[in-house]
C-alpha cells in the first residue's frame, strides 16, 4: 500500500498545484480553504442586501425596515445572490488554476456600497447602467494588466493615499451599518444623531455588534458569519427576523433577472440626467473609481498576505502577481455579466494562509464551497438588515487599521490622506473621498516646493477630478 506521502507526490493535486515545492499537503490546503470560506461567506448574505437598495429587486418592495429583504419572494435579489456565489467561485477558481495562489475573490465590500449609494442613489444611474460601468472597468483592468500601465498607476499614487482609501472605505461602510441598524439616523439640526437605542432594530444591531466583537477579539474563525447567524436568531423574538415560509434548501436561483442587463446607451447618454459631455465625464470618474479601488484593494491584500506568509520571490514581489491581478479583472468582468458589483481579492484570505494554505488548492476549495452555497438561497431570505449591519461595522474596523501606517507627521501627506478618509462618509461617496485626496496632494506639494514628488499621472488625475466637480457640482 502506498504511503500518504507517495500518494500526494503522484496525485493530480501535486501536478496542478506543486504542493511539495510549496511545502504543504492536500489536507492542509483543504482545511485552509474551508477556513477562508467560513471567514468570508458573509458576503453571500451582505452583498444582495446592499445591492437591493440600488434597485436590484422587484419594483415596490424596496423597503428600509426589518423584513424588507426577502430573497424567496424576489427573483431579482435571488439572482444577485446567485451572481455573488458564481462570481466568487469563478474568480477564485481562476486564482487557483491560473495563478496557483491561496487567495479568494468575491464582490468587494465598499465597492458594492459605492455601486449602490454613490453611483445609483447619488449620481442617479440605474443598476443596469452601473453594471455597464463595472463591465467597462473590468475590461479596462484587463487591458492595464496586460500592459505596463498597471505598474505605472500603482507607482504613481502615494502610499499614504492608498492607505487612506482603505481607511475611508472602512469608515464609510461602518456608517452604512450604523444607519441600516437604526443606531444612526438623519437629523435636520445636527445632520446625524443617535436613533432610538431601545427600538427593536437598534437593540438587535447592538447585540450583534457585541457578539461579533467578542468572537473577533477571541480570534474565533468565521466570527463575522457566526455573528450574522446568531444576530438573525436573536432577531426572532424581536420580530425582526421573519421565518414564515422559509425553505433553507432550494434549487439555485435563476440568473435571468440580472444576466447581461447592461444599459450602455443610458450610461453614456442621459442616464444621469446630464448632457452628453457631462454624462461622459461622470462615467469616466465612476469607472476610474471602480478601477482604482479594485486595483489598490487587490494589490494591498496580495502584498500584505504574501509578505506575512513569506510567499515573495527573490525580488520581494508576490509570485504570479500579474496572474492574480488578471484573475481579479476577469472575475469583475464576469461578475458584471452575471449581475453583481466589482470583484476584489479578499483580505479574509489571510485566515486560510494562517492555517497553512500556500497554493491554488486552498482557493479551489473555497470555489467549490461557493458553488455549494447556491443551494442555500433560502438562508438569504431569513437574514434582516439588522443582522448584516454588525458585519459592516466590524469590516469597517478591519479596513480602518490601515491608517496606522499613514505618515501624519508630514502635513503634505497627512492632509490629502485625512480628506480622503473624512470626505467618504461625510459626503456619502467613496469617489468624492478619492477625488479630494488626489486633488489636494499636488496642491500642498507644489505649495511647499516639492512638486517633483508628485507623479505626472497624479497631476492628470487631479485635473480630471477638478473638471468633474466643475461639470457635476
Q: What do these predicted ranges mean?
A:
Residues 2-78, 193-194, 228-322, 463-467:
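Helix-loop-helix hairpins and the membrane-proximal interhelical loops
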Residues 22-33, 73-81, 85, 106, ...:
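Hydrophobic, aromatic-rich alpha-helical transmembrane segments
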Residues 30, 50, 153, 222, ...:
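Residue-level signature of catalytic and energy-coupling elements of molecular machines
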Residues 123-237, 241, 364-473:
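Membrane-embedded alpha-helical modules
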Amino acid at each position: 500500500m502506498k504511503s500518504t506521502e507517495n500518494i500526494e507526490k503522484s496525485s493530480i493535486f501535486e501536478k496542478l498545484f506543486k504542493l511539495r515545492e510549496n511545502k504543504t499537503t492536500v489536507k492542509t490546503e483543504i482545511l485552509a480553504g474551508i477556513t477562508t470560506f467560513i471567514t468570508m461567506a458573509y458576503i453571500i448574505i451582505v452583498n444582495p442586501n446592499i445591492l437591493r437598495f440600488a434597485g436590484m429587486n422587484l419594483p415596490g418592495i424596496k423597503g428600509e425596515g426589518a423584513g424588507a429583504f426577502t430573497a424567496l419572494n424576489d427573483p431579482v435579489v435571488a439572482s444577485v445572490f446567485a451572481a455573488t456565489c458564481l462570481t466568487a467561485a469563478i474568480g477564485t477558481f481562476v486564482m487557483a488554476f491560473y495563478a496557483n495562489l491561496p487567495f479568494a475573490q468575491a464582490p468587494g465590500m465598499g465597492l458594492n456600497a459605492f455601486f449602490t449609494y454613490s453611483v445609483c442613489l447619488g449620481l442617479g444611474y440605474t443598476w443596469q447602467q452601473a453594471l455597464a460601468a463595472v463591465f467597462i472597468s473590468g475590461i479596462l483592468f484587463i487591458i492595464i494588466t496586460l500592459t505596463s500601465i498597471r505598474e505605472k498607476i500603482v507607482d504613481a499614487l502615494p502610499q499614504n493615499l492608498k492607505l487612506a482609501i482603505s481607511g475611508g472605505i472602512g469608515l464609510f461602510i461602518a456608517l452604512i451599518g450604523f444607519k441600516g441598524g437604526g443606531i444612526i439616523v438623519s437629523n435636520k439640526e445636527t445632520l446625524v444623531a443617535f436613533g432610538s437605542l431601545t427600538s427593536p432594530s437598534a437593540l438587535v444591531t447592538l447585540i450583534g455588534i457585541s457578539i461579533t466583537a467578542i468572537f473577533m477579539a477571541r480570534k474565533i474563525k468565521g466570527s463575522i458569519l457566526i455573528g450574522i447567524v446568531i444576530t438573525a436568531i436573536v432577531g426572532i423574538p424581536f420580530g425582526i427576523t421573519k421565518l414564515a415560509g422559509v425553505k433553507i434548501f432550494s434549487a439555485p436561483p435563476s440568473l435571468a433577472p440580472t444576466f447581461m442587463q447592461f444599459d450602455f446607451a443610458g450610461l453614456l447618454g442621459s442616464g444621469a440626467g446630464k448632457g452628453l459631455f457631462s454624462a461622459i465625464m461622470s462615467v469616466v470618474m465612476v469607472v476610474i473609481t471602480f478601477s482604482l479601488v479594485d486595483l489598490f484593494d487587490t494589490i494591498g491584500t496580495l502584498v500584505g498576505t504574501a509578505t506575512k506568509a513569506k510567499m515573495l520571490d527573490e525580488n520581494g514581489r508576490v509570485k504570479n502577481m500579474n496572474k492574480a491581478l488578471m484573475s481579479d479583472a476577469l472575475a469583475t468582468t464576469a461578475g458584471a455579466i452575471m449581475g453583481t458589483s466589482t470583484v476584489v481579492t479578499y483580505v479574509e484570505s489571510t485566515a486560510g494562509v494562517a492555517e497553512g494554505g500556500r497554493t491554488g488548492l486552498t482557493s479551489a476549495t473555497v470555489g467549490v464551497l461557493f458553488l455549494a452555497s447556491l443551494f442555500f438561497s433560502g438562508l438569504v431570505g431569513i437574514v434582516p438588515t439588522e443582522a448584516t449591519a454588525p458585519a459592516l461595522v466590524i469590516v469597517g474596523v478591519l479596513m480602518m487599521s490601515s491608517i496606522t501606517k499613514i505618515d501624519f507627521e508630514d502635513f503634505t501627506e497627512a492632509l490629502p490622506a485625512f480628506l480622503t478618509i473624512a470626505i467618504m462618509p461625510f459626503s456619502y461617496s467613496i469617489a468624492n473621498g478619492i477625488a479630494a485626496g488626489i486633488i489636494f496632494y499636488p496642491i500642498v506639494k507644489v505649495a511647499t516646493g516639492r512638486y517633483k514628488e508628485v507623479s505626472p499621472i497624479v497631476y492628470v488625475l487631479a485635473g480630471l477630478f477638478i473638471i468633474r466637480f466643475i461639470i457635476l457640482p
